[in-house]
């Protein structure tokens, strides 16, 4: 369809930007008022800057609901400036926090007074929305103009445009009387095309896509129940389009096709790198192909005949920050209405420009939707919890989920409601939102006065269990709220794995693992669904891939993400380096990251092992090969990092020059309780594993020369690993974190000959090796067979000396239990699984978790304290990687041939479990496995 998409990209008739990225702007107007209240930098009616222009002074205030602190609202005076004469025109220029205000051409303010952004809180220093607060006063406005860097965002005669929504309009003047209204100068894009049908339709199909999110409608009805189309890709290189059968939606005579565009990841916030990463403005492309019963056909496509308006209900929208919907601005898309003007033709997507260098043979492409679109998969009914603080009404949907809400309310026209979301509550019932960092995560609904009104945000996504309903610039009563439902949205909906055992906490853990997967497998496999991040972290995905494939059918979803990963490697354009996130986003280490970039080999391999589709390996082989070659290129040495007193510094140990040692950028065993495992150690272990996967892949694909090459490479890395860290007695030892505060150190000679003191980790010393160090070495088959028996002893000790508690982080989590079982330590694995004290898998379960936490100590129930807000998600699937062990070992379901064409059943029992049962639906059918212990007897049942 790509070559046949003969249509224009259309949007606003003028150039636009995202006002949440505009910190340099100008507002001008003429006015008549004794007390003008000009509002700017407005996130909503409780968070804004007010320029109060009175008869004899101008006062500037910051108004805030202070939600990220103590919920005590404040109105802070930023400055008062006296004037001596009457004024009727203003020109306000803002540059970040500096204010330059002219009244009738006379400078009144030139001060740096506006509030600054605060780390890990919603942004303040941007234009966002503007308006007028004329409560208990009146103002008459004309010639209102809003611009940034000579780009006019709004200039209205108040006849039919967006700014007319701020008040009542007559004769080119806007009157605001005892009212407070704000609008985003660049709201959603609304498009329509009216046309007639005069023949009998045989079939009709709509093809559509957008730069940004879109909702398409025929005659006012959505063409599907999808959310967030066209999905998330690297929009510089590839955008998906969707296909809809709309045969039954068209009518005889008059028809209209319409679309509403939101910013999405295209021009909205994307990761924590800011807004407009891919582009500045949303645009839409579509073709409606109609076939008539007489054999003729007609194509209605996006072109200059379409109409545009920005005076519409969705006045603001961001996937991270939330959606604002004003029901008073709803319209009939078929009706004649002065608000509609000619649309703008937007530039066709350009040849992709990569992050590094240039690409000579890569073109932008529109590709068909791969896998399921995002849809509502479950409705959770909210229950009222408490009112705290006053007029803040908190509801619990019962499950930490990802998606949106369905809110039913009643009230007067113009009343406005603010909806905030949290994963947890404080002990007093107030929602916990500090872990959202700068993501406002807030929706706004303004009522039109119907008996019952329903609001479902469609362009914003939230990760939440708790919903707080409050007034937006006003107080509301609980009676206004009829119901609050949580709508869980995901791209995956087919359960393939079931597990149950005699321990209800472990059963709840399995529930939490699955719901963490369902929620985060939305558009891409995100790390978390709630804060200003939500990126496709490669490290998270590679540790969870096997668990994810047991739980749910993720074949097409991950197949699409592997396209994203290939695109990310292409657009990163760094000699085969794989960036940390796909699609390519912010915070990518300069030269690829061990344990993260290895997703390029691990995820395709896990998908092939589960589904047996050789096309996965064929598609990914070049990516896999480029990554492994990049890892082992000679110029990679000395590019690595390690930690010094908790801070990252360049790796300069004596190992840095040894061939096959992976001295590279690495995040190490992220969020571990034992940070001793050197980055250089985990990176080398993963490099060996990637080489091992690649040699097996080469064998399957019949690439004999490559198989030989990568077999030798694996053996060489394994040998280097052993020489560096494996002792004759099977234990491992290493120089870990550099510190001046250690009691037991060793010395290492740097490249320049200087001596550095490193903490030395070895058995029978004050500092012992980590659980992760042993887990990686064992699970990646890096320990020689003649040493493995002794390694088993030391591996066991790494668990027991921590009282049967976990210390692993992200890189060790998926390998710990499998490695223990590999060396016959099933009893230790069960001990870890059944541990209930922190850190453990069951600690969060005991304390009410319904998904997997990012940290072992995201919340400490004993003290009621939360973890570090800079990184404290309560829906982070990585630590749920233990789930694979439920299926492979407790149930004993393992493939012998790829795709489970043949398989083995080898269940294990242990710990305090008296029964376990479950199943896995493979490509060849359902496999069930169940065992129980009763009166000392073991009974096993299986069904295939």
Residue ranges and their predicted role:
Residues 27-29, 83-95, 99-103:
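Short tryptophan-centered beta-strand motifs in secreted/extracellular beta-sheet-rich domains
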Residues 1-18, 37, 50-77, 94, ...:
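Extracellular/oxidizing-compartment recognition motifs
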Residues 212-213, 303-311, 476-512, 518-519, ...:
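Active-site acid/base region of carbohydrate-active enzymes
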């Amino acid at each position: 369809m790509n070559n046949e998409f003969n249509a224009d990209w259309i949007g606003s008739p003028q150039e636009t930007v995202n006002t949440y990225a505009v910190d340099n702007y100008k507002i001008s107007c003429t006015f008549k008022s004794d007390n003008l209240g000009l509002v700017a930098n407005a996130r909503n009616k409780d968070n804004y800057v007010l320029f109060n222009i009175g008869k004899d002074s101008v006062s500037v205030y910051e108004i805030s609901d202070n939600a990220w602190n103590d919920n005590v609202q404040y109105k802070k005076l930023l400055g008062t400036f006296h004037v001596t004469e009457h004024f009727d025109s203003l020109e306000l220029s803002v540059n970040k926090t500096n204010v330059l205000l002219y009244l009738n051409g006379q400078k009144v303010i030139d001060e740096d007074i506006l509030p600054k952004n605060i780390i890990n809180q919603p942004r303040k220093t941007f234009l966002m929305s503007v308006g007028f607060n004329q409560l208990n006063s009146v103002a008459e406005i004309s010639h209102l103009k809003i611009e940034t860097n000579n780009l006019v965002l709004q200039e209205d005669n108040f006849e039919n445009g967006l700014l007319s929504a701020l008040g009542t309009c007559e004769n080119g003047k806007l009157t605001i009387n005892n009212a407070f209204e704000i609008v985003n100068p660049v709201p959603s894009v609304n498009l329509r095309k009216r046309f007639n049908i005069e023949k009998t339709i045989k079939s009709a199909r709509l093809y559509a896509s957008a730069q940004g999110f879109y909702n398409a409608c025929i005659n006012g009805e959505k063409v599907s129940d999808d959310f967030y189309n066209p999905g998330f890709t690297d929009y510089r290189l590839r955008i998906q389009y969707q296909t809809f059968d709309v045969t039954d939606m068209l009518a005889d005579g008059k028809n209209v096709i319409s679309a509403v565009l939101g910013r999405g990841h295209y021009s909205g916030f994307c990761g924590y790198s800011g807004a407009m990463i891919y582009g500045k403005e949303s645009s839409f492309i579509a073709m409606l192909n109609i076939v008539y019963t007489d054999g003729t056909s007609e194509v209605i496509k996006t072109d200059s005949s379409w109409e545009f308006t920005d005076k519409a209900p969705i006045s603001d929208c961001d996937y991270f920050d939330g959606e604002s919907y004003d029901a008073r601005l709803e319209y009939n898309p078929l009706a004649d209405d002065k608000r509609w003007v000619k649309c703008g033709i937007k530039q066709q997507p350009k040849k992709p420009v990569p992050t590094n260098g240039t690409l000579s043979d890569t073109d932008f492409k529109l590709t068909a939707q791969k896998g399921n679109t995002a849809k509502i998969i479950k409705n959770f009914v909210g229950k009222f919890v408490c009112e705290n603080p006053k007029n803040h009404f908190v509801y619990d949907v019962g499950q930490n989920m990802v998606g949106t809400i369905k809110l039913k309310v009643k009230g007067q026209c113009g009343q406005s409601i603010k909806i905030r979301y949290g994963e947890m509550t404080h002990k007093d019932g107030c929602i916990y939102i500090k872990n959202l960092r700068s993501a406002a995560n807030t929706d706004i609904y303004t009522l039109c006065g119907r008996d019952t009104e329903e609001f479902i945000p469609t362009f914003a996504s939230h990760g939440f269990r708790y919903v707080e309903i409050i007034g937006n610039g006003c107080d509301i009563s609980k009676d206004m709220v009829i119901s609050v439902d949580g709508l869980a949205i995901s791209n995956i909906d087919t359960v393939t794995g079931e597990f149950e055992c005699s321990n209800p906490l472990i059963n709840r853990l399995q529930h939490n693992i699955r719901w963490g997967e369902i929620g985060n497998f939305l558009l891409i496999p995100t790390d978390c669904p709630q804060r200003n991040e939500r990126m496709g972290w490669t490290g998270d995905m590679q540790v969870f891939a096997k668990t994810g494939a047991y739980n749910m059918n993720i074949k097409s979803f991950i197949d699409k993400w592997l396209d994203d990963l290939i695109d990310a490697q292409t657009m990163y354009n760094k000699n085969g380096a794989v960036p940390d996130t796909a699609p390519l986003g912010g915070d990518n280490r300069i030269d690829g990251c061990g344990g993260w970039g290895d997703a390029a080999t691990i995820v395709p391999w896990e998908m092939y092992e589960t589904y047996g589709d050789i096309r996965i390996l064929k598609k990914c082989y070049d990516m896999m090969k480029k990554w492994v070659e990049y890892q082992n290129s000679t110029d990679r040495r000395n590019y690595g990092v390690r930690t010094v007193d908790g801070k990252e510094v360049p790796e300069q140990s004596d190992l840095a020059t040894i061939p096959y040692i992976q001295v590279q950028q690495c995040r190490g065993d992220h969020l571990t309780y034992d940070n001793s495992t050197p980055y250089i150690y985990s990176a080398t272990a993963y490099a060996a594993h990637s080489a091992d996967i690649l040699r097996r892949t080469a064998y399957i694909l019949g690439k004999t020369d490559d198989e030989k090459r990568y077999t030798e490479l694996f053996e060489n890395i394994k040998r280097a690993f052993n020489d560096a860290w494996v002792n004759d007695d099977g234990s491992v030892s290493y120089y870990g974190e550099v510190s001046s505060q250690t009691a037991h150190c060793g010395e290492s000679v740097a490249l320049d000959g200087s001596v550095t003191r490193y903490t030395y980790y070895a058995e029978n010393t004050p500092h012992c090796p980590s659980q992760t160090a042993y887990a990686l070495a064992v699970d990646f088959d890096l320990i020689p067979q003649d040493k493995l028996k002794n390694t088993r002893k030391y591996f066991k000790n790494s668990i027991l000396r921590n009282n049967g508690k976990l210390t692993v982080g992200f890189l060790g989590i998926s390998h710990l239990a499998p490695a223990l079982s590999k060396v016959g330590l099933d009893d230790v694995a069960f001990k870890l699984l059944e541990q209930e004290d922190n850190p453990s898998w069951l600690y969060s379960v005991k304390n009410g978790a319904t998904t997997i936490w990012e940290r072992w100590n995201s919340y400490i129930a004993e003290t009621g304290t939360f973890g570090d807000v800079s990184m404290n998600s309560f829906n982070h699937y990585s630590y749920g990687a233990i789930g694979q062990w439920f299926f492979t070992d407790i149930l004993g379901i393992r493939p012998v041939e790829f795709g489970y064409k043949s398989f083995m059943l080898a269940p294990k029992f242990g710990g305090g479990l008296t029964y376990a049962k479950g199943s896995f639906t493979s490509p060849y059918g359902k496999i069930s496995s169940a065992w129980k212990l009763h009166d000392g007897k073991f009974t096993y049942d299986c069904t295939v």
